[in-house]
From Swiss-Prot:
It comes from Homo sapiens (Human). The modification N-acetylalanine is found at residue 2. This is Proteasome adapter and scaffold protein ECM29. Keywords: Acetylation, Cytoplasm, Cytoplasmic vesicle, Cytoskeleton, Endoplasmic reticulum, Endosome, Isopeptide bond, Nucleus, Phosphoprotein, Proteasome, Repeat, Ubl conjugation. Signal peptide: none annotated.
């Protein structure tokens, strides 16, 4: 054994020595490279030898080699082989360690293209190797990435790096790439430099312990990372830039998962080199929408890179090695990372990294203002998005950081603003952090005072956000806050005061008196933003009902009054008091005004009514209640606290009145005047008496410049005066009469007039009251006559001003008379001359229609008229007055009609009217007429006039007015027996007005109907309902119509189209009520519907319909389940009237927002049902309602309804009406969005159910729809669902994919098919290619590709049969091309799973291969090329046999094309499969290469395909033929035996090619080929048969030596010649030409003498042609003559050439034919065209070359002399041919040959002197030849001839 080992070792050493020797002998680089390529890999393998000597020898050799290589950088190493060797799992580590050295050395030397080619191998080689070696390989790979070419469409099959199955390698590569991207340019790893030395440059994180000896790495890297990137050969900055660009390109090409590479792009985008940063930025932007920034993997990586390896307290032994510890990245990179963190919710939640990033950005050593700004943005982001649980631990740290920044950093106002804003946001998220820290509030207030203007806004915003945190303060904290707010309310900065107001209004409860006081002071602020906010807060009313408003909502009136009084008295002693003229006020007027209004609100609130300060009229409604409260306060004797008891007044009411008086005296003001009037009027007995001595002051108020002020003052005066009696009263009235008549000042007259009227009125009221209370006639009789006269005088004085030229005084007189008349009979005569009651009535009535009068005058005149019968039970002109009021309607005066309505009501009922009450002390409801009052009720008469005359008037304005009066009567006199007894007539009247075109008329009528219904008893109500329903729904006339001649419904208003107004709204309401089986509900609906703006006015509000509506809403509540669906739809009705009405009802009924969700199913059912209603209006409203319903609510419960909704909307999308179509489109778009959201995988089972429900509908109905918009939306939805649903699509793929494939053709514009049919073949192919390309990039294909990602064996079983069916029977280019594309994708997505189905798919694709459309054919071939990779061998064999059969047997070009395309595709995409079946494929390819190409057809392209297949898969053509010779001969034989002539010819060409390329064929193949070819020759001539002849000639020429041997089954030369010569006798001229040429070639090759037979065929034809060409022209047309000439020419040329070739070396034969042949040639030389001359000369050259007479041993001087003479005579023609140089050239060659031969045979004497002279003369003519070489040659030959003489 030892001996054997020694021997083997010696052999190895000897081998190594020989290699050494060869290396030594290598002189050139090329030689050295060849030796290295051959021997380096095996030499390295010797390192695994067990023999020390061998290993030593190898090392010596390698040392020598290294020296040689290093000095020669161009020498290439066998890197590919070395990489294979390196990957060998059996190789020992010693070998691999050395192998990688040479890989590292050789790889960078390779051309770039080769490096790119080997790049994937480098990656593969890394698997399982030691870390340093992996680093080395990556160092080689990274520079190559820049040069790599990636496919445009990324797919796994086309990807150069197939990384899907190598997750570990991917991770290694990504880590290395990240380090490369982090590496700064020009960085040098200085071993002497320690980390600690550069701590200042590294920021907060470089303080890493225990690494003092390790050099400082670049930011973001560890020492180890830097070292491995630098490697053995550090990159220059330019190379590093290229590497980084290469990495970005690599990521762009999607070679690694997008998720993994996000961080790399972010890092690259921060690069200092523009090219890298721009490329990365662009890529990041393009992927922005695809990246999930909430993915924890991405965010954690970003944090890790940003922060580096932070030393945390870890378990023992878990501390990171110093050289592996990564530093944080540079500020530049941080600036790129943080913006991406800002996109991420996950980043905000990740603790503790989020807070570390914040602190690093704000306070890190290396931070800058940009980073600080971004960090603050991140704080904002955390505050907004971080969930409650996760923000809790962050709060204190964030707050500390922000306060620290605010305190320390003052340079950048913008930054400070952000910091303050962040504090505000933090407070709104975590109020508990701030609640106890009032110092922070103070700090911010102070900052607001002192900071720059641009920062103040942020502080203001922050403080506003912080307010909520302090709303629960109590005790000392609250007091502290009060003081704080109070101190800042007086600061000069407006923002400070504004925020202080915010704090005062929000921090404290609304009944907190000190804060309200502060707000009241703020309400007097000069700046609008401050006082506006304060007023808004103060006037914000408590809840409308007592349930809502608790007693705490406003301060109690007494307490608030005392507080104000205390503050006022205190302020009067300080400089803050306000001086105005001679008056001193405790507050400025604005604040004081707000204070008294607020006190009035507190008073109202304490009195139990809703406080309001908006309208004096509204305030007066509450006077009786306030009066009761004031009486209580006055009688309870409530006193002020002792501290405030300094002004003398102790009762809160008195203090309140004192404050009002003070303000009124100092500044005045209408609201203040009203408040004082109200306070006194409600309790005059106690309070008015105090003002008796202040009548002069009151009079001064009556002289105020403002009319309203004078009116209120006059009222006040009358209240005060009414408390006095006797002479005092008399003198006051006389004084008033006097001032009234004094016309110096209209204002004084106006005030006095009003005061006089009000005073007389109050006097009469008191008189009436005394009479009713005491019934004391005697006392009554005691009334002083002079008082009565005075009252009459006063009344007449007032009356005299009715005709005043001043409207002001006329109105005042009218008002005053009204007041007198309201309270008692007018003290003037009824009739007669002068100022009488009749005159007064007529005067006032005449003013109402007058255009000269103002509206105010008219209003007052109407009111006054209405009051006369109220105060006077015996008023004589009551009916005249009422008739006058009703007849005064002219134009449309709505407001006036409401006033007339009120007046008619009051006048009709007379003394029983509520107008008779004292409005200050009694409400309408509380009033009852005095028992003894005389009844003057004319309601029956009024009702009769309105119903029988005015409501049926032809004038629409009169009808409207009558309706309003009727409504007023019904509302105000609801209990009147006359109204109750005429309910049906009144209803009929209201119904008749419903059809008016005027909206208000309709609304008034509908409100009236509601009131009428409420008034009836049960039986009445039933009758009213049935009548109303019948009238509304049928349009029949009402039975209670008064006048048979008057039409109730004017102008065909009933039954108008829905677009019109008319009754449609009420019909709908009636229909709605009927559907609920509750017809009476129509009245409730009417009350809720059409809430006209009029009802919000003072006049309208008096009817109290808001209350009625609320009650109606409550009564309808039980019907909500039936109502909600209908009402929901009606809100979207196209008819504006119906829509508004129904929306009003909806708003009244549906107060709970969750109601829609509660009744979702019912609403949906109603909408879907009505989508196909026969009324367009209903269809449109259903679509719009559905659009609204679907948005923003969970639809999990109605998934099963979705298909029905889709399908119904699809139908509506094709509606006849455009507005309906648009509504349907809107609904469909919303439905699409909702469905896409519901198909999200996060929805779980609901998502699955949604997809299962939707897909059939979208595929079958949507995509197949004839409506373009429906199809487009369906596809769009499917695409979005596929993106959203992801893996959930898998179960539905078998249905989805085929449907989408079908749609590729269905959805294509049909015009393309038309154009395709009309186009040429070339145009058609180009167009179809473009169509298929468009289909492949369509949304449908995008969806299909999405689905394909998730396919596996579980769904393929169902999908494949459908796919096969579609391939076979699918219609359309797009569908078939798409199917092929899907199959290709399947082969790459799930190759193993596809194997069982590949056979079926192949079978289906075969039908596509024979498709007439070339584009489909190519697509199917392409698919087949991929599919064979996954199929079983048996299937592949069957396919190849099928293709072989098609090619050999089918004559149609389509079959041949499909074979070429398929085989080519298999070769390109599944080369391994082709190699496994090479024996079947390559012979066919060889045969295919030799197809005879038709000019017009695509055979040329097919030949190229076959050629490519052949060349790609054989080791050189010669090697291929040798390898597959048997198969090639078999297939060519089969081709020759084919019935197709074309195939026979193709077989022949292939055979010829075999013979040519092998140079020699050996038995038995030669015999087989020749036999087959000769068999083919037998029989008639056919197109292409020439190829057989050419093949025979070719084979014989190539194998002439083999043919000399006699071999069984191999035809002899004689047999071959016999067969070919036989073909020369065929009639077909073209064929004959080829046959003669081939026969000549064979004769030449075999040197056989068959000249006799050959010349017998050829020479007669030459002679015949000569005769024909010189003969008479035939009658054939020019073209035929031309063709015949060409054929003759071709024949002559061929014949002469053949004669030259067939000229034998046989003395006897030559003797027989030399003379004849020479003569023939000479003749043709003289007579022919230049082409024939050229051919003859060439033939002559061959003739003389083989002429034995020119050889010494066969000399015959005489015969030769004769031949030469003949020749010389004829050749002179050619030599002298001046036109064609080619003829002259060939002629010179012949003479040169002759002279050379004569010289060699020494037979000069045979060239006679005659010949020489002829030749010399002809050669002399060439001396001036244009071509120098001919000139020279001619001169040389001439000289030779001359020398002979």
């Amino acid at each position: 054994m030892a001996a054997a080992a020694a021997s083997a070792s010696q052999d190895e050493l000897n081998q190594l020595e020989r290699v050494f020797l060869r290396l030594g002998h290598a002189e050139t680089d090329e030689q050295l490279q060849n030796i290295i390529s051959k021997f380096l890999p095996p030499v390295l393998l010797k390192l695994s030898s067990t023999q020390e000597g061998v290993r030593k020898k190898v090392m010596e050799l390698l040392v020598h080699l290294n020296k040689r290589i290093k000095s020669r950088p161009k020498i290439q190493l066998p890197v590919e082989t070395l990489l294979v060797q390196y990957q060998d799992p059996a190789a020992v580590s010693f070998v691999t360690n050395f192998t990688i050295i040479y890989v590292k050395m050789g790889y960078p030397r390779l051309p770039v293209e080769k490096q790119c080619e080997l790049a994937p191998t480098l990656l593969t080689a890394m698997e399982g190797k030691p870390q340093p070696q992996q680093d080395s390989l990556m160092h080689l790979l990274i520079p190559t990435l820049f040069h790599m070419k990636y496919p445009v469409e990324s797919s796994k099959s086309a990807s150069p790096f197939n990384l899907a199955e190598k997750p570990k390698t991917v991770q290694l590569l990504l880590d290395f790439m990240l380090d490369v991207l982090l590496m700064p340019y020009g960085y040098v790893l200085n071993e002497s430099q320690s980390r600690q030395n550069s701590s200042s440059a590294q920021g907060s994180s470089s303080n890493s312990g225990g690494g003092s000896g390790i050099p400082q790495p670049p930011p973001g890297m560890s020492f180890y990372a830097a070292k491995r990137v630098i490697g053995d050969n550090p990159w220059t900055p330019e190379q590093l830039e290229q590497c980084k660009l290469g990495i970005v390109k690599f990521i762009e090409a999607e070679q690694v998962p997008e998720l993994e590479a996000v961080l790399h792009l972010v890092i690259a985008s921060s690069d200092t080199r523009h090219s890298v940063a721009t490329a990365a930025d662009l890529e990041l932007k393009s992927k922005q929408s695809l990246i999930d920034w909430n993915n924890p993997a991405i965010i954690n990586k970003m944090y890790k890179v940003y922060l580096g390896d932070i030393p945390l307290k870890t378990k023992e032994g878990a501390v990171l090695k110093p050289e592996l510890k990564r530093d944080p990245v540079s500020t530049r990179v941080k600036l790129k990372i943080v913006p991406h963190l800002l996109r991420s919710r996950q980043a905000a939640e990740t603790f503790p990294a989020n807070i570390q990033v914040v602190y690093d950005g704000l306070f890190g050593t290396n931070t800058n203002s940009k980073l600080r700004t971004l960090s603050l943005q991140f704080v904002h982001h955390i505050c907004i998005t971080c969930p409650e649980i996760k923000i809790k631990p962050l709060g204190p740290m964030l707050l500390n950081g922000l306060t620290k920044l605010i305190n320390e950093y003052k340079e950048d106002p913008k930054l400070l603003s952000m910091a303050y804003s962040a504090v505000g946001k933090l407070s709104s998220r975590m109020p508990h952090l701030f609640t106890k820290d009032i110092a922070l509030v103070q700090q911010l207030f102070e900052a607001l005072c002192k900071e720059e203007p641009e920062t103040r806004l942020a502080i203001q915003e922050a403080l506003s956000m912080m307010v909520g945190a302090y709303s629960t303060l109590e005790g000392a904290q609250r007091t502290l806050m009060e003081a704080l707010v109070a101190s800042y309310l007086i600061k000069p900065e407006v923002q400070v005061r504004q925020v202080a107001v915010k704090f005062a209004s929000t921090v404290f409860p609304s009944d907190h008196i000190p804060s309200r006081y502060l707000l009241l002071l703020a309400a007097g602020d000069p700046r609008e933003e401050v006082h506006g906010e304060a007023q808004r807060v103060l006037r914000c009313l408590p809840g409308r009902n007592r349930k809502e408003s608790t007693s705490e909502q406003m301060p109690s009136f007494p307490e608030m009054v005392y507080y104000i009084q205390e503050k006022a008295s205190h302020r009067m002693k300080t400089p803050v008091k306000y001086m105005t003229g001679t008056t001193v006020l405790p507050f400025n007027p604005a604040a004081f005004g707000e204070i008294v209004l607020y006190l009035r609100m507190c008073l109202a609130h304490s009195a139990g009514v809703v406080p309001t300060s908006q309208s004096l009229a509204d305030m007066q409604d509450h006077a009786p209640a306030i009066g009761r409260y004031i009486r209580t306060l006055m009688s309870s004797g409530q006193m002020a606290p002792s501290s405030s008891n300094k002004s003398g007044e102790t009762n809160p009411v008195q203090i309140y009145i004192g404050l009002l008086q003070q303000l009124l005296a100092g500044v005045g003001g209408l609201p203040v005047m009203y408040c004082l009037l109200e306070a006194v009027s409600v309790y005059p007995e106690k309070l008015a008496t105090k003002f008796v001595d202040k009548t002069e002051w009151i009079k001064s108020l009556m002289n105020n410049s403002k009319e309203e002020m004078r009116e209120l003052a006059a009222l006040f005066y009358s209240v005060v005066v009414s408390t006095v009696s006797g002479n005092e009263l008399k003198s006051m009235i006389e004084q008033l009469i006097k001032t009234t008549k004094d016309n110096h000042s209209p204002e004084i007259q106006h005030g006095s007039l009003l005061a006089l009227g009000f005073t007389v009125g109050r006097y009469l009221a008191k008189k009436k009251m005394r009479m009713s209370e005491q019934q004391d006639l005697e006392r009554n009789a005691d009334t002083l006559p002079d008082q009565e006269e005075l009252i009459q005088s006063a009344t007449e004085t007032i009356g005299s001003f009715l005709d005043s030229t001043s409207p002001l005084l006329a109105i005042a007189a009218c008002t005053a008379l009204g007041e007198i008349g309201r309270n008692g009979p007018l003290p003037i005569p009824s009739e007669g001359s002068g100022f009488t009651k009749l005159h007064l009535v007529e005067s006032l009535l005449s003013r109402i229609p007058s255009s000269k009068e103002t509206n105010k005058m008219k209003e007052r005149a109407i009111q006054t008229l209405g009051y006369f019968p109220v105060g006077d039970g015996d008023f004589p002109h009551q009916k005249l007055l009422l008739q006058g009021l009703m007849d005064s309607v002219e134009a449309k005066q709505i407001e006036l009609q409401f006033t007339i309505g009120e007046a008619i009501t009051s006048a009709a009922i007379g003394t029983s009217s509520v107008a008779a009450r004292d409005a200050w002390q009694m409400t309408e409801e509380e009033y009852t007429p005095p028992a003894g009052a005389k009844v003057n009720d004319v309601v029956p008469w009024v009702l009769d006039v309105i119903l029988n005359k005015h409501i049926i008037s032809p004038n629409p304005h009169v009808r409207q007015a009558a309706c309003i009066w009727l409504l007023s009567l019904v509302r105000k006199l609801s209990t009147h027996k006359e109204v109750k007894s005429h309910l049906k007539e009144i209803q009929s009247a209201f119904v008749s007005v419903l059809s008016e075109n005027d909206e208000l008329s309709q609304d008034v009528a509908s409100k009236g109907l509601g009131l009428v219904y409420e008034l009836g008893n049960e039986q009445d109500q039933q009758e009213l309902v049935s009548t109303l329903v019948e009238t509304l729904m049928t349009g029949k006339r009402v039975k209670h119509e008064v006048s048979g001649e008057t039409v109730v419904f004017q102008g065909g208003a009933l039954g108008k189209t829905p677009d019109g107004q008319g009754l449609s709204t009420y019909k709908e309401l009636c229909s709605l009520a009927s559907d609920l089986s509750q017809p009476d509900l129509v009245y409730k609906f009417m009350n809720l519907a059409n809430h006209h703006a009029m009802w919000n006015s003072r006049k309208g509000a008096a009817f109290g319909f808001n209350v009625i509506a609320t009650r109606a809403g409550e009564q309808l509540a039980p019907f909500l389940p039936q109502l909600v669906p209908r009402l929901y739809r009606y809100q979207f009705d196209p008819n504006l009237g119906i829509r508004q009405a129904m929306t009003s009802i909806w708003n009244a009924l549906v107060t709970d927002k969750s109601m829609v969700d509660k009744y979702l199913k019912e609403i949906l059912q109603d909408l879907v049902k009505n989508l196909t209603s026969n009324m367009w209006r209903v269809r449109e409203s259903s679509c719009l309602a559905l659009n609204d319903l679907l948005r923003g609510r969970p639809l999990d419960d109605i998934i099963d309804k979705l298909p029905e909704i889709w399908e119904t909307l699809f139908r509506v999308q094709d509606d006849i009406k455009e507005s309906v179509r648009k509504a349907a489109e809107l609904a469909l778009k919303t439905l699409s969005k909702v469905c896409v959201k519901m198909c999200d995988p996060a929805k779980g089972a609901a998502g699955q159910r949604t997809i299962a429900a939707l897909l059939p509908c979208l595929l079958d109905k949507g995509m197949m729809s004839t409506v373009t918009e429906v199809r487009a939306l369906s596809i769009n939805t499917l695409v979005k669902i596929s993106k959203s649903a992801g893996a959930m699509l898998k179960p539905h793929a078998p249905k989805l994919i085929p449907a989408l494939l079908e749609s590729l053709s269905v959805l294509e514009p049909q015009v393309l098919n038309y154009l395709s049919l009309r186009a040429t073949e070339q145009e058609k192919a180009a167009m179809d290619s473009a169509r298929l390309s468009a289909a492949k990039s369509s949304p449908m294909m995008e969806t299909i590709n999405m689905c394909l990602q998730y396919l596996d064996v579980s769904v393929l079983g169902e999908l494949v049969p459908r796919l096969c069916e579609l391939i076979r029977s699918g219609v359309g280019l797009g569908t078939k091309g798409g199917c092929a594309s899907v199959i290709v994708s399947l082969t790459t997505q799930c190759p193993q799973d596809l194997t069982p189905y590949s056979g079926k798919l192949m079978s289906a694709l075969l039908s596509g291969l024979t498709d007439r459309n070339s584009v489909i054919q190519k697509s199917c071939a392409f698919a087949m090329g991929h599919l064979v990779r996954t199929s079983r061998d048996s299937s592949t064999e069957k396919l190849l046999q099928k293709l072989n059969g098609w090619y050999m047997e089918k004559e149609e070009p389509i079959y041949k094309t499909s074979c070429a395309l398929t085989i080519h595709a298999i070769g390109r995409y599944s080369p391994d499969v082709l190699k496994n079946h090479a024996k079947e494929v390559l012979p066919l390819a060889f045969l295919g290469m030799h197809e005879i190409a038709d000019e017009e057809k695509s055979e040329k392209e097919e030949c190229n395909l076959w050629t490519e297949v052949w060349q790609e898969n054989v080791p050189g053509s010669f090697g291929g033929i040798r390898l597959y010779l048997q198969e090639l001969i078999t297939i060519t034989q089969k081709a020759l035996q084919s019935q197709s002539w074309k195939m026979k010819a193709q077989g022949a060409i292939a055979m010829a090619s075999i013979a040519k390329q092998t140079s020699s064929l050996v038995p038995p193949y030669l015999g087989m080929i020749l036999t087959a070819l000769l068999q083919g020759l037998a029989g008639r001539t056919w197109a292409g048969k020439e190829e057989l002849l050419k093949a025979i000639a070719c084979v014989v020429t190539a194998c002439s030596a083999e043919l000399e041997k006699s071999v069984p089954n191999q035809p002899s030369t004689n047999e071959i010649l016999q067969a070919v010569l036989k073909e020369c006798s065929k009639e077909n001229v073209k064929y004959k030409i080829v046959a003669i040429s081939c026969a000549a070639d064979i004769l030449k090759a075999t040197k056989e003498d068959r000249f006799q037979e050959f010349s017998n065929i050829v020479i007669p034809l030459i002679k015949k042609n000569s005769l024909e060409s010189s003969g008479v022209r035939t009658t054939k047309n020019e073209e035929e003559n031309e063709k015949e000439k060409e054929l003759q020419l071709e024949y002559l040329l061929g014949a002469f050439e053949s004669l030259g070739k067939a000229w034998p070396r046989n003395a006897e034969t030559q003797r027989c034919y030399r003379q004849e042949l020479c003569k023939l040639m000479c003749e043709r030389l003289k007579l022919s065209t230049w082409k024939v001359q050229l051919g003859v000369l060439q033939s002559m050259n061959a003739f003389f070359q083989g002429l034995m007479l020119l050889e010494e041993e066969h000399a015959d001087p005489e015969a030769l002399a004769e031949i030469l003479l003949e020749t010389c005579k004829s050749i002179t023609y050619s030599l002298e041919n001046k036109t064609y140089s080619s003829v002259r050239t060939e002629a010179l060659s012949v003479i040169e040959l002759l002279l050379k031969k004569l010289e060699e045979s020494k037979q000069w004497e045979c060239l006679t002197s005659e010949c020489r002279v002829l030749l010399i003369e002809s050669l002399a003519t060439m001396e001036p030849d244009s071509r120098p070489e001919l000139q020279e040659k001619a001169a040389l030959l001439k000289k030779t001839l001359e020398n002979l003489e």
